[in-house]
Amino acid sequence: MSNKTAWWKKSVVYQVYPKSFCDSNGDGIGDLNGIRKKIPYLAKLGVDVLWLNPIYASPQVDNGYDISNYREIEPTFGTMEDFENLLAEAHEAGLKIILDLVVNHTSDQHPWFQESRKSKDNPYSDYYIWKDEVINNWGSSFGGSTWEYAEERAQYYLHCFAKEQPDLNWENPKVRQEVYDILRFWLDKGIDGFRMDVISLLSKDQSFPDGPVIQNKAYGSYYAGCANGPRVHEFLQEMNREVLSKYDIMTVGETPHTNADEAALYTDESRKELNMVFHFDHMHLDYDENGKYATNRVPLVALKKVMTQWQDKMHECNGWNSLYWCNHDQARAVTRFGNDSEEYREISAKMLGTCLHMMQGTPYIYEGEELGMTNADFTKLEEYKDVEALDIFKD
């Protein structure tokens, strides 16, 4: 199918964070049957695609982004039958469903890692990235070093996120084939595509260079050796050739530390990688030494410049934009980009919605964004059920 007529170019995507969306059984946690209950609402809202955050089996250290079994549903959310019913009912209502694909890392409880950590000579020994010593200054996104010692193997493994999320070794062709089999499993069930978590980090610079130390941090940034690495486009082209191109689906990659020129390489139709990417240029405009937890206002002129740059570049390179103001990793749009006071909340939400939907690209709406939801008013640390926030606080 040509990109000029691709269905995802005419779609609006609604992001569902299952835990907090709708609870069907009264246990205080959202679930798949809760999402099913809301299909009439979502269809009436006028969205076209539902993006579900991870629903796979997981210890939930990072709210499902630590996957222990890619072919099972997290019991908290329901069963595979529940998912299949949700998919069928969504399709019947004219809604498509895409799933979160998390394959930069797994849970440390995944059978691959449980085997890999046992020894240096078992079939899974090089499914992950192991070193005899801490070889660089990289710091994890969630605080501390990216290197964790495993006594059983007497080596260190790499984890760009929590220590319970070891990074997969994409240099190993067996790992890539395992991932492609997982893709086929879900695509053969009839899902309509994937949002690919931190997909720009798959290929590590095999020299593992030290990263720059900024803002008085204790560690260097791992992005210097991970983001947009030397083989990432090769890997994605292989994935597209072997799996993605065989289905009528949409793909969007989360690509931290990727500028518009680099994004063109991921999204140019002729390169056969991804349909679009999530960039972070507009997300970083209010950063200071506290990063995403800064309380600065977003500078309007700088925001306009960034959005214009991405509009122009994606049009120029025959790529496609993903348009978003917020998601599960970011502050609420009205609070961050508008004014969440009683006087201005509604008009701020309408202004942001108008801006989002009038640009070229596929709009993404985070659950509640259509209502003008604002940041949660948490006053106690224990109210935060987020490993990143808690680890950064401790760090």
Model-derived regions, located:
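Active-site and adjacent substrate-binding regions of carbohydrate-active enzymes
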Residues: 1-395
